[in-house]
Amino acid sequence: MRIGMVCPYSFDVPGGVQSHVLQLAEVLRDAGHEVSVLAPASPHVKLPDYVVSGGKAVPIPYNGSVARLRFGPATHRKVKKWIAEGDFDVLHIHEPNAPSLSMLALQAAEGPIVATFHTSTTKSLTLSVFQGILRPYHEKIIGRIAVSDLARRWQMEALGSDAVEIPNGVDVASFADAPLLDGYPREGRTVLFLGRYDEPRKGMAVLLAALPKLVARFPDVEILIVGRGDEDELREQAGDLAGHLRFLGQVDDATKASAMRSADVYCAPHLGGESFGIVLVEAMAAGTAVVASDLDAFRRVLADGDAGRLVPVDDADGMAAALIGILEDDQLRAGYVARASERVHRYDWSVVSAQIMRVYETVSGAGIKVQVSGAANRDETAGESV
């Protein structure tokens, strides 16, 4: 099968949707399918040979964060050219609401179209502006996928259409078998934080507020931080406890997996804006206990707290108590890890990709190819105005 995939977010920086798209493409290619991915990327970024750059992206407020997206007249022409030359059996558009390549592809294409909805919020001003323009194009989507019940419910409420729920995928073995980082396991306890720590919704402020109690109980505790941000500023915020922070910075997938395996606990103190919780799944696959904010998305991944400890959102004292409880009780920690290990296999790519392929096969059953829509060709000027 020839599959075209569109990712709206730039490959210049790592992100959950970008990772999902690349991993799905690799799994499908390994299964013998031909895959082409269209995504924003700067000229200096090294891309797999199956990824076509849609051009350099610009930062735009989206989903309570800042996403790097791509749009404009030249981009619209590039999207149409990619569709016309792709001869795709299926076009899989990720985040069709994002004002980027995904929105342009949905406008320009017709035929067997699948869309995956990753987010579950409409907080973006940009999205609210484009929503009225986008509504008619949603009728083109034949197969709808939501990565979580939250994303599915949002689609039903905002767009009036249902979707099949298929979660994000993880290569469970790559996390379970990852080597430890050099110098690990440490004699002291290690708590992992992963994400953009200068983005408020990731909740680093909650973990920092919990740190004094952690240090009082475990004087040699280490907060292992993986992700982007201002190290000097965070050290200043930590004050006298800055010595307990270790920064790895932005790392590749292999190092991330090793960091997961090397920690005693993965802490996810997020404040909101999450529709799934892929990093929790990765920690579960690595055999690392999870302590997370009691967000709806996290609660579903952790089976209402059976596969990991849930803490009220923005509760530093509760986070400290939960982390201390798991760090000082090996049996409790092992129980969470064992139950998480049983649960995590439902997220393995072998399971998830098979579910996605069934959607592809359903929408492409008539043998019609994806092509540039007649409306897009007739109304070039209107299309470029998007």
From Swiss-Prot:
Q: Recorded E.C. number(s)?
A: 2.4.1.345
Question: What is the membrane topology noted in the UniProt record heading this document?
Answer: Peripheral membrane protein
Q: Where is this site: Important for catalytic activity?
A: 118
Cite the InterPro entries for this sequence. Answer: Glyco_trans_4-like_N (IPR028098), Glycosyltransferase_grp1 (IPR050194)
Q: Which residues bind GDP-alpha-D-mannose per the record?
A: 9, 16, 196, 201-202, 251-253, 256, 274-278, 282
The cofactors required by this protein are: Mg(2+)
Pathway annotation: Phospholipid metabolism; phosphatidylinositol metabolism
Q: List where in the cell it is found.
A: Cell membrane
Molecular function GO labels: GDP-Man:Man3GlcNAc2-PP-Dol alpha-1,2-mannosyltransferase activity; phosphatidylinositol alpha-mannosyltransferase activity
Catalytic activity, reaction form: a 1,2-diacyl-sn-glycero-3-phospho-(1D-myo-inositol) + GDP-alpha-D-mannose = a 1,2-diacyl-sn-glycero-3-phospho-[alpha-D-mannopyranosyl-(1<->6)-D-myo-inositol] + GDP + H(+)
Q: Broadest EC class? A: transferase
Determine the domain of life of the protein's source.
Bacteria
Q: State any GO CC term.
A: plasma membrane
Assembly state and interactors?
Monomer.
Give the protein name, as stated in the record: Phosphatidyl-myo-inositol mannosyltransferase
Q: Which species is this UniProt entry from?
A: Mycolicibacterium smegmatis (strain ATCC 700084 / mc(2)155)
Q: Which gene encodes it?
A: pimA
